[in-house]
Amino acid sequence: MSQQPKYRFYPTLLDSFQNYVDSDSIWDKYYGTSEDPSISVEEFHDQKRRDLIDNINRVEHESSEAAAKGTCLNEIVDRIIMKQKSSESNVIVKTVRDFDTCVGAFNSVVKDENSEDASELAKETITRINQPFIFASVDGFRFCFDIAFCKEVANYFSDCLCQYRTSATLPTSKGEVELYGYIDYLREKSIFDLKTTKSYSFGNYSKYNQRHAYPYCMEESGMMSEVRDFEFTAYQLSGGNSRTPLITGKQNKEVYTYSRSQSVEILTENCERFIDFINDNISEIDIEKTKIFKDR
């Protein structure tokens, strides 16, 4: 008889742990060739450790522009696929075809205390873009997406099931672990995760735990009899600045054939190492806020 899970992990939390483990090599990749790096390898290591502890404790951080941009594109694509004009998401999405709708879009996010004039912003935006676009805003960031680009992305994921929650239990020598999370897009025997990036090179997502956890969860839970592959569909975005406000992008596909035995081995090792880290640093974990323990 199966035991109740002792821990609950989602893939990006395991990724945060992996970034901490790999902090030296990550530092070397981005700062190793600099004669005067802005951060030392020791400081970078400490930063990744702090990030991990904060993620475990569910500490809220201000969203970055890059993260907000990705969230907005995902929301736009979901609404196009599901033919929804609104959702329960906190992302504001409006199709702008003229000056008045542009003013309305900016009015929905511009706060009086910012002393910004929505009409002036709308006029400047309309003049620069000079074509209909999709306005999206979240966490104080505003973006203008090219309609044709958004439809192209949505068309690629047409007939997909969107934002599907999955979970399953993984046995480890340290205790049962519940793996869980939301799959961006699901079609037949393939699982897709939509990524946005400023620059891309193949293999960017090779160590991401999503490609192991989500297929495992879908098969283990019985929701899919077989998962063939996992695809990171990465869009390298351009635009989104004052000079070129309209955002468009280029598609890059990073596809991994799913091997259950390989993924189980990797997930088990990652979870067991993460559990060791948790036990070694239990004094820094906020038991009241964290959700990594199943029975608390």
Predicted feature residues:
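Metal-dependent nuclease catalytic cores that hydrolyze phosphodiester bonds in DNA/RNA
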Residues: 1-182
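Amphipathic alpha-helical interaction segments
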Residues: 35, 114, 222, 266, ...
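Polybasic (Lys/Arg-rich)
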Residues: 265-296
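General structural signal for secondary-structure boundaries
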Residues: 10, 131-139, 143, 147, ...
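Secondary-structure transition/capping residues
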Residues: 84-88, 225, 285
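Mg2+/Mn2+-dependent nuclease catalytic core
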Residues: 166-277
